[in-house]
Amino acid sequence: EIKQLAVRLIEDKRTIGVIGDLFIDCTGFSSILLENYLGTRFIKFDDLANDKAFYARIPYLSQEHREKHMHNVTDCEAAENGWMWTIPLWNRIGVGYCWSSRFAMENETKPEFERWIEEKFDVAPGEYEIGTIDIKHGYHEKAWNLNVLGIGLSYGFVEPLESTGLLTTHENILRLVDVLSRRQGYVTQIERDWFNYAAQREVIGFSKFVAMHYALSMRTDNPYWRWCTQRNEYMQEQFDMSVRVVDNYERMGSSLDLDQTMDVNMNGLNYIVAGMGVKLGRDWLNDRDPDELVFVDNAHRTYEKEVYDFVCSEECPSHYEYLKEYIYGGDELRAELI
């Protein structure tokens, strides 16, 4: 028996039956429709240890405080049992600590997070509140099961070290629009299978990319980092996608562009490897035309000098000044309300 989903809604003490061709599960980690109702299997990413996160909102205490801490990038810092993030917004600073309950207790990590906040941002304990999030690492075996499609956390999640969770949500929405537009909403099972293959290939690739940030670290100063760098066997599943790829299946899917995913072919590892101080195993320059390398190097030096000169000049606004003048139109009151 095909267990298609029909929803009963409770409205004004009345039960209303709703039948639809497609239900999109946006119920977050609960995955009420995809997992709880249809029983779609959840597959964990065991090589990612972090399963908890603290978060807090730090107020700007003064104009000077805002000028000091507001900038245009998200900062990530390695911590004792995970990593901490800083996201300076217009009205506040968003901070958090992604950590693992396998290696530390809350009464250890929370004081560490509090000390970090108070030292980094010069705030007192009563000027912020800390919340907790339980992280559910992994994905469902099928994103699209019968007439239910999980998008966002209801389908899967990878910790936000590289914002890949947001990207998979974006890509699955575009993929759905593409599939539905091909034959005016008529979708077959094989098209759902192709969708699921592309979604799974993408999220697994992103999880491995994130895992390499830990695997290539040189830290061994506590149980958490020793597990990440010396104990965890990443290679057991690291290249399972290449083993599981069925050539005919990919060729069929590519004819409809349903197998197209973001770049998850691990080329990004070059930058992680270089950042960790590892010398690349081949001479990448040998593959390049010498004249091309000289041209690129000169262009980069020219650009770098121009940027440096501008940043050091009085003409360069601070990030706060730029937002105020060019985004919020110089209206301080309006800027404060947004």
Residues covered by each model-derived region:
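Extended charged low-complexity segments that act as oligomerization/scaffolding linkers
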Residues: 7, 64-67, 116-120, 179-182
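Predominantly flavin-linked oxidoreductase catalytic cores and closely associated redox partners
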Residues: 1-112, 173
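Contiguous mid-protein beta-loop-alpha structural module that forms a pocket-lining wall or clamp
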Residues: 159, 164-180, 188, 202
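FAD-binding beta-loop-beta segment adjacent to the flavin cofactor pocket
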Residues: 131-151, 156
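Acidic/polar loop patches that form or flank catalytic/metal-binding clefts of enzymes
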Residues: 63-67, 125-129, 184-192
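Short, conserved secondary-structure transition motifs
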Residues: 57-61, 136-140, 196-205
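Long, low-complexity C-terminal extensions of enzymes
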Residues: 178-338
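Conserved FAD/dinucleotide-binding core of flavoprotein oxidoreductases
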Residues: 78-134, 156-167, 185
